[in-house]
């Protein structure tokens, strides 16, 4: 698991290789990731947008961005967390994602 805290909001990420949804002979690799966003502030925060850069070991690069995550813009109360699971297809067995969330203090 990887975690980072910025402005009182902690983001933790766990990744999982999805063997049943991958086909290495066709260079298709599926990964799931679980993200936990925890609010350490004394006020609520709302997740407005996401921005991800996805890279694989073949130097393929794509950007994923948009409003909220998995169809919602969650409001996270002080001391609470929001968790979701999503997935990513890669064309190689190695890759990385980096990015950020745009949050609003409420």
Model-assigned labels for residue ranges:
Residues 29-34:
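Short, solvent-exposed loop/turn segments enriched in Ser/Thr/Gly
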């Amino acid at each position: 698991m990887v975690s980072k805290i910025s402005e009182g909001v902690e983001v933790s990420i766990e990744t999982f290789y999805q063997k049943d949804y991958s086909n290495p002979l066709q260079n298709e690799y599926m990964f799931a990731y679980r993200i936990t966003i925890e609010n350490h502030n004394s006020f609520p925060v709302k997740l407005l947008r996401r921005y991800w850069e996805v890279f694989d070991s073949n130097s393929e690069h794509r950007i994923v961005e948009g409003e909220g995550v998995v169809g919602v813009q969650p409001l996270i109360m002080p001391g609470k967390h929001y968790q979701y699971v999503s997935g990513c297809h890669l064309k190689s067995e190695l890759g990385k994602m980096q990015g950020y969330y745009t949050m609003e203090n409420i």
